[in-house]
């Protein structure tokens, strides 16, 4: 009985909708780019994504959300096809003080994650920053497979 209850609880947590990672970097043009990676519980309905800064909407894929005038024509949000990532591109990102940005994903549930962004501490966006962990995992796996073959 306890095993069944534990299994049900663990499966429930394993399939929960969540934001797994929120990263930020500076583009070559010195604009802010944020990637919000998420996991969904179902393929439908299509999720919406909203980025806010201090309760002001920076950008959203939800047509019901009005963009704050401060970010009009500066903030663009898009859900990246096939990789469960919502991307914010913000032009004219000032470097006066750290700012809190929140990514909110809404599908069946609403989940969010907040990150403090300080321009002077941001790294340059690159292919390595996007795919570095995947590349490292691939190389490590390849080395382990080659070692296993020779044992």
Predicted feature locations:
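N-terminal V-set
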Residues: 39-74
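Short beta-strand segments of immunoglobulin-like
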Residues: 20-27, 38
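Non-cytosolic beta-sheet module surface loops
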Residues: 38-40, 92, 105
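Extracellular beta-strand/loop-rich beta-sandwich domains predominantly from IgSF
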Residues: 69-97, 107-109
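Type I single-pass or GPI-anchored cell-surface glycoprotein architecture
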Residues: 1-16, 108, 122-151
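Core motif of extracellular immunoglobulin-like domains
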Residues: 34-36, 47-51, 101-104
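Extracellular/luminal immunoglobulin-like beta-sandwich modules
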Residues: 100-124
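Structural beta-strand segments of beta-rich domains
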Residues: 30-34, 86
